[in-house]
């Protein structure tokens, strides 16, 4: 399965973003600390995607943004379905949720618990997951086949500092309201 990563173009999925493709030449990539990447796919149709969310919920801030788990999951699943996936074929792989700082609450564990519960409630089986621990991960995902690769990041101290700053910015800034053209169906 590792040969699906050869001769491909890499598309980076940043915090608060999601990507969907039917192109077998595209591989999604992201680096995670306490954040979560849900990789959801329908290998029979050849479509899939990855999200990268920062926090499980907006904690009462009223935020509707892909920075938050529920919205990120809804956007990803709807995006995959719009590309022709059958809900009954969807499978997931989940990564991230590390405890990046002893000085912060365990945001990673909260994120991991959220995504596992969300997928279970939605009836989407989690085929594999790598969550928790104390180190960052780089994840590559071939969305059309569901193949995934993970490597642990050796020097993740800077990532932990960046995540603390991102959490602070997210909690301080109001979330962007979706444009009318976003047209997302929540289920």
Curated annotation (Swiss-Prot):
Probably deamidates glutamine residues to glutamate on methyl-accepting chemotaxis receptors (MCPs), playing an important role in chemotaxis. Keywords: Chemotaxis, Hydrolase, Plasmid. HAMAP family: CheD. One of its GO terms (molecular function) is protein-glutamine glutaminase activity. This is Probable chemoreceptor glutamine deamidase CheD 1. InterPro entries: CheD-like_sf, Chemorcpt_Glu_NH3ase_CheD, Cytotoxic_necrot_fac-like_cat. Belongs to the CheD family. It catalyses: L-glutaminyl-[protein] + H2O = L-glutamyl-[protein] + NH4(+). CDD domains: CheD (cd16352). Signal peptide: none annotated. Its EC number is 3.5.1.44. It comes from Ruegeria sp. (strain TM1040) (Silicibacter sp.). It comes from the Bacteria. GO terms for biological process: chemotaxis.
């Amino acid at each position: 399965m590792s040969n699906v990563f050869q001769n491909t173009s890499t598309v980076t999925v940043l915090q608060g973003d999601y990507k969907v493709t039917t192109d077998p030449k595209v591989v999604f990539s992201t680096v995670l600390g306490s954040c979560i990447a849900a990789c959801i796919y329908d290998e029979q149709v050849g479509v899939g995607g990855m999200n990268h969310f920062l926090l499980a919920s907006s904690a009462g801030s009223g935020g509707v943004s892909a920075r938050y788990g529920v919205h990120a999951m809804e956007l990803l699943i709807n995006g995959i379905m719009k590309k022709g996936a059958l809900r009954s074929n969807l499978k997931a792989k989940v990564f991230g949720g590390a405890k990046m700082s002893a000085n912060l609450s365990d945001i990673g564990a909260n994120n991991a618990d959220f995504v596992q519960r969300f997928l279970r409630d939605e009836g989407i089986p989690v085929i594999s997951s790598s969550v928790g621990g104390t180190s960052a991960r780089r994840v590559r995902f071939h969305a059309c086949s569901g193949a995934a690769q993970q490597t642990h990041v050796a020097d993740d101290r800077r990532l932990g500092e960046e995540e603390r700053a991102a959490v602070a910015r997210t909690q301080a800034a109001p979330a962007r309201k979706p444009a009318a053209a976003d047209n997302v169906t929540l289920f």
